[in-house]
């Protein structure tokens, strides 16, 4: 009856029937169960429980449960237990459950309870949205019957403990009022008929609050650094911050971080970016905070200081790498070392920052600005140019240095300046110096050279504008300043141009001031000589010569020189004796004549007995006096003297006044007067008088006659006397128109031989007349003869006796030196055919100064050869003959620059102690000889030889130098004396023989004292002209002294056989004779070997005529 599947309606009907039909005695119905309770409900079951009815024996008892849904469905169950679960129900349905007890077929009353099954849970519960304070949930209605009248319940619990419940009739709900960033557990159920479904749960997190204070911390060319503060609300632990930057070109970079700062890199330079930042936790993002920023542009490239002035600095740069620099702005910031600062901007890639302080260091920063963001800065230090130096001027100048000074430039910071000095000479070449001082001395400059100086200040590499000044060094002093000539109103000076460049462009100034005066006079000249005129006679002048170039005066060379006094006047001999001559003259009319010294010089012009006294000294004698008269004493009787008088002051002599005067002859002594054998005459013998005499006059008894000079000491017969008589006899000595009568002697004649004497007298008379006619005709014939034309055959003069040399010179001087020309012509071809192969070799060409002056092979002086140096044994030098040796001298050319070393090798190898130099290094603007000795004490080295100047003595016409030659390898020395004659022009002759003779005497004295060592080395320029003349003069004067002979022609020919062109010009050949003649005039010594005195033809004629007349008188 109560089987499964039975419906409640049937049961009800049955119950009702039972109740209504219960008529018999039936068992009592059990009590209904007590406390019927719904224990649980599910979506498909309802669990009920109840208590056993009162008094019911549970044995054989059965409980019926019938649940009828609101949809009409019924489920029935029975059980013996006091609980039951009715399943198979529909979810979410309202059921009426009836429970009764049936025992023994008897049902108790029904206990009823209305309840419902639980609805199905909601479907597809999901979080629809989350904010920082709410979570939106949605779901779908549960499976099952119509959800009408259903209620949805939501319960949530946050991780911070916050909880709550919400309900809704909809399928979505937004739970708000939540804490941000919190995890919430949501439980969702459906409530219907008072029964809730099982819960659907979801966890959901509220979004965080947005980050706070989002800002851009930094921007670089490839990154943007952002920072923010944690959101308000809950602890952001386990939260992630998301950053997304999107550029204006669409490029996006995203970064996640748990920190509150991030650097987004990998961005493009100079680009605008929109950066979004949000918080993410449990997959929930907060709202986005946005900031717009830009990356920094790349820095400018190649920032360069383009120009600097004293008030501005120009900068240039290149646009930065990266996107188009349009809309970029360039900023420039500068700070000066004085604190001055400023900022400029430009849209260009260059800028000039002006109004700056001069000479200041500025730090420049340049950046690119784009989108309000500046690039990193490029910096450059640059200094404005200092102002130009002030008051640039020359402080001092020498021949090798110029000292400049200046004032610091205007400006606020003159310290730490470096000053640069650049100078260029007019010969080219530039030097640069720098200094931190306001002065500098430029050294090692060329003398007499114009230099252009540029001076500028520099600071930190910035140069100020230049200040320029042109200044010349001081020219060197002129050298070899000497007095060449002088008169009573002029002084001629000569000098050598200063050492240094540009000699041709020098001008020279001469200043002179007379003694006692203070106002000098000056005169300029472009040459190296000058003659000062209109000077006072007999006055001392202080002379100063300097070179000038570029308007700068050179160093002074000074000389004290005097004009000659005027010559004395009215020179006369007042009285004379046989041993003295009294001279008298008038003093010159000069202002200083009271200070004059007068010199009297006398020399014998000879007398017939001169050759008989080899011990006599006929050299000029000189004496001085302060008076205008002088008695010359200790003279030789009967001698013709040449007297010369001149005034002197300051060692300068006036022109001379001369006269010739003879001393009276000496008286003779009649030593014998004997009668002839016939008694018609006497034989007189008288002594020869001392000194000179020309003839004698005899007077015997009033009878007079003449005898020649040779009659003294011989018996002279005086005839025509009467026998046996006494006659007074005197002898008159005749000399130069003067007569001196001897003491009278009485002679006695014998009485025999008158007739014989007369005959002999007549015969002698006729003979003498014949001789007289012969000599007179011969003399007239010689006078009438005219000179004949010379033919081509010349007679070569041999050695000439000293006493004939004057005549020889006078004869050759006739017709414009025609005789000398003949002799010199004969010398022209001497030696030309000899070999000169060594000198002509190609390796030796450069060693020859002149191509036509080459040494002969046989006479050249060879040097010791140097290994593997062809031609090293050659020098243009020749051995020359002398008086005693074929190699008494060495003649050589003046050294060339390339042969100076060879020259000193020659000196060393020949061990020569003597050098004779007859040229100046520079003559007429041309180099004649290299300056081969040191200029000062600093030695010069040539190969293995070192030359040192030990001493120097400068005289008017020559200089003597002491040199020391050191062989470095052998450590041996050689002393050398150089005699440098400076008054002999090339191809010419000195103005007077006197200076050369004085030079020769000094040289010969040295050579006589220095016998050891090699031959003297003599040179001029070519080594033939002046060199040959001096060698010939030395040899011939020594020949004169030793032999009394002179052979100029022979010796010159002999020299030319050893070296070509010796005595190079006819003028030098004539001058050689003039020097010898002058030497003879200065010397009274006769050669010892000569006994026969010199007599010219006219004197011989005179003496013969005088003899004839004397014999005529005798007759």
Swiss-Prot record:
Membrane-topology annotation of the record: Single-pass type I membrane protein
Disulfide bond positions: none
Tissue expression as described in the entry: Expressed at high levels in the brain, spleen and liver and at lower levels in the heart and stomach. Expressed in pancreatic and colorectal cancer cells, but not in normal pancreas or colon. Expression in hepatocellular carcinoma is related to the differentiation status of the tumor and expression is inversely related to tumor aggressiveness.
Recorded consequence of changing residue 1020 to S: Loss of activity. No induction of apoptosis
Reactions catalysed: O-phospho-L-tyrosyl-[protein] + H2O = L-tyrosyl-[protein] + phosphate
An example Gene Ontology molecular-function term: transmembrane receptor protein tyrosine phosphatase activity
Source taxon at top rank: Eukaryota
Modified positions (Phosphotyrosine) in chain numbering: 1094, 1102
All ranges on the Extracellular side of the membrane: 28-754
Active site (catalytic residues): 1020 (phosphocysteine intermediate)
Keywords, in A-Z order: Apoptosis, Cell membrane, Cell projection, Cytoplasm, Disulfide bond, Glycoprotein, Hydrolase, Membrane, Phosphoprotein, Protein phosphatase, Repeat, Signal, Transmembrane, Transmembrane helix
Cytoplasmic side: 776-1115
Function summary: Protein phosphatase that may contribute to contact inhibition of cell growth and motility by mediating the dephosphorylation of focal adhesion-associated substrates and thus negatively regulating integrin-promoted signaling processes. Induces apoptotic cell death by at least two distinct mechanisms: inhibition of cell survival signaling mediated by PI 3-kinase, Akt, and ILK and activation of a caspase-dependent proapoptotic pathway. Inhibits the basal activity of LCK and its activation in response to TCR stimulation and TCR-induced activation of MAP kinase and surface expression of CD69.
Domain description: The extracellular domain mediates homodimerization. One or more cysteines in the extracellular domain is essential for the formation of dimers probably by forming a disulfide bond. The cytoplasmic domain mediates the interaction with LCK.
Protein name (record): Receptor-type tyrosine-protein phosphatase H
């Amino acid at each position: 009856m109560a089987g499964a599947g039975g419906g409640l309606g049937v049961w009800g009907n049955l119950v009702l029937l039972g109740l209504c039909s219960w008529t018999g005695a039936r068992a009592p119905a059990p009590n209904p169960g007590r406390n019927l309770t719904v224990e649980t409900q599910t979506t498909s079951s309802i669990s009920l429980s109840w208590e056993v009815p009162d008094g019911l024996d549970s044995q054989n008892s059965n409980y019926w449960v019938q649940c009828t849904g609101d949809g009409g469905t019924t489920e029935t169950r029975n059980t013996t237990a006091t609980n039951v679960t009715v399943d198979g129900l529909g979810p979410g349905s309202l059921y009426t459950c009836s429970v009764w007890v049936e025992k023994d077929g008897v049902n108790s009353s029904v206990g009823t309870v209305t309840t419902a099954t639980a609805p199905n849970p909601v479907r597809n519960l999901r979080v629809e949205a989350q904010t920082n304070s709410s979570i939106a949930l949605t779901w779908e209605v549960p499976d099952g019957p119509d959800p009408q009248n259903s209620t949805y319940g939501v319960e949530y619990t946050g991780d911070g403990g916050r909880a709550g419940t919400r309900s809704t009739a909809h399928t979505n709900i937004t739970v708000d009022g939540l804490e941000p960033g919190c995890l919430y557990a949501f439980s969702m159920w459906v409530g219907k008929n008072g029964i809730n479904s099982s819960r659907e749960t979801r966890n959901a997190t509220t979004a965080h609050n947005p980050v706070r204070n989002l800002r851009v911390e930094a921007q670089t060319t490839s990154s943007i650094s952002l920072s923010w503060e944690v959101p308000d609300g809950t602890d952001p632990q386990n939260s992630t911050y998301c950053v997304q930057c999107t550029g204006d070109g669409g490029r996006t970079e995203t970064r996640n971080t748990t920190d509150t700062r991030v650097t987004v890199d990998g961005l493009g330079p100079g680009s605008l970016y929109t950066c979004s930042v949000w918080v993410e936790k449990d997959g929930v993002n907060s709202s986005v905070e946005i900031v717009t920023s830009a990356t920094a542009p790349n820095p400018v490239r190649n920032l360069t200081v383009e120009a600097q002035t004293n008030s501005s600095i120009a900068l240039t740069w290149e646009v930065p790498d990266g996107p188009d620099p349009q809309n970029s702005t360039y900023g420039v910031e500068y700070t000066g070392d004085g604190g001055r600062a400023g900022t400029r901007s430009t849209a260009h890639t260059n800028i000039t920052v002006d109004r700056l302080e001069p000479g200041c260091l500025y730090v420049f920063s340049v950046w690119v600005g784009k989108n309000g963001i500046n690039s990193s800065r490029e910096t450059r230090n640059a200094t404005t140019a200092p102002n130009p130096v002030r008051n640039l001027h020359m402080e001092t100048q020498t021949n090798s240095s110029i000292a400049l000074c200046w004032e610091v430039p205007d400006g606020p910071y003159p310290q730490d300046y470096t000053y640069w000095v650049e100078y260029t000479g007019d010969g080219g070449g530039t030097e640069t110096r720098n200094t931190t001082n306001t002065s500098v001395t430029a050294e090692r400059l060329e003398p007499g050279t114009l230099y252009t100086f540029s001076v500028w200040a520099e600071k930190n590499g910035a140069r100020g504008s230049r200040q320029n000044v042109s200044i010349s060094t001081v020219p060197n002093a002129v050298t070899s300043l000497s007095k060449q000539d002088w008169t009573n109103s002029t002084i001629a000076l000569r000098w050598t141009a200063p050492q240094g460049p540009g000699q041709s462009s020098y001008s020279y100034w001469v200043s002179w001031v007379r003694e006692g005066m203070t106002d000098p006079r000056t005169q300029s000249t472009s040459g190296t000589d000058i003659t000062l005129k209109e000077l006072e006679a007999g006055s001392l002048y202080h002379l100063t010569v300097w070179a000038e170039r570029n308007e700068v005066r050179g160093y002074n060379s000074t000389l004290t020189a005097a004009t000659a006094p005027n010559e004395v006047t009215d020179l006369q001999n007042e009285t004379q004796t046989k041993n003295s001559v009294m001279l008298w003259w008038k003093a010159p009319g000069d202002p200083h004549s009271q200070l004059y010294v007068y010199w009297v010089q006398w020399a014998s012009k000879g007398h017939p007995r001169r050759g008989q006294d080899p011990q006599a000294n006929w050299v000029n004698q000189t004496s001085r006096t302060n008076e205008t008269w002088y008695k010359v004493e200790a003279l030789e009787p009967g001698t013709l003297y040449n007297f010369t008088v001149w005034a002197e002051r300051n060692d300068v002599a006036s022109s001379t006044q001369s006269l010739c005067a003879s001393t009276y002859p000496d008286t003779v002594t009649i030593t014998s007067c004997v009668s002839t054998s016939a008694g018609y005459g006497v034989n007189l013998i008288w002594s020869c008088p001392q000194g000179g005499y020309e003839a004698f006059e005899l007077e015997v008894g009033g009878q007079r006659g003449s005898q020649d000079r040779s009659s003294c000491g011989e018996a002279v017969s005086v005839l025509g006397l009467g026998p046996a008589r006494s006659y007074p006899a005197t002898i008159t000595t005749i000399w130069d128109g003067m007569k001196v009568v001897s003491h009278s002697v009485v002679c006695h004649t014998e009485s025999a031989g008158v007739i014989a004497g007369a005959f002999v007298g007549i015969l002698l008379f006729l003979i003498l007349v014949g001789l007289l006619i012969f000599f007179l005709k011969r003399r007239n014939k010689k006078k009438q003869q005219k000179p004949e034309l010379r033919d081509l055959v010349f007679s070569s003069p041999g050695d000439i006796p000293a006493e004939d040399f004057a005549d020889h010179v006078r004869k050759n001087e006739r017709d414009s030196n025609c005789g000398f020309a003949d002799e010199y012509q004969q010398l022209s071809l001497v030696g030309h055919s000899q070999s000169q192969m060594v000198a002509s070799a190609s390796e030796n060409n450069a060693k020859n100064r002149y191509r036509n002056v080459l040494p002969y092979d046989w006479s050249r002086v060879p040097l010791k050869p140097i290994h593997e140096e062809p031609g090293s044994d050659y020098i243009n030098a020749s051995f020359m003959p002398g008086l005693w040796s074929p190699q008494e001298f060495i003649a050589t050319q003046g050294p060339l620059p390339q042969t100076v070393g060879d020259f000193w090798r020659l000196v060393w190898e020949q061990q020569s102690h003597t050098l004779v130099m007859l040229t100046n290094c520079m003559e007429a603007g041309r180099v004649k000889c290299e300056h081969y000795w040191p200029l000062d004490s600093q030695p010069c080295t040539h190969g293995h030889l070192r030359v040192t100047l030990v001493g120097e003595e400068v005289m008017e016409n020559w200089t003597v130098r002491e040199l020391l030659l050191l062989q470095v390898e052998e450590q041996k020395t050689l002393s050398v004396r150089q005699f440098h004659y400076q008054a002999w022009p090339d191809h010419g002759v000195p103005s007077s023989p006197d200076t050369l003779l004085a030079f020769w005497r000094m040289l010969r004295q040295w050579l006589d004292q220095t016998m050891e060592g090699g031959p003297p080395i003599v040179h001029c320029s070519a080594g033939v002209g002046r060199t040959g003349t001096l060698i010939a003069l030395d040899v011939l004067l020594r020949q004169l002294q030793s032999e009394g002979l002179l052979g100029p022609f022979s010796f010159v020919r002999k020299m030319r056989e050893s070296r070509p062109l010796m005595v190079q010009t006819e003028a030098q050949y004539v001058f050689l004779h003039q020097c010898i003649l002058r030497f003879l005039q200065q010397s009274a010594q006769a050669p010892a070997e000569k006994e026969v005195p010199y007599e010219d033809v006219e004197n011989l004629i005179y003496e013969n005529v005088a003899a004839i007349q004397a014999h005529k008188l005798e007759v």
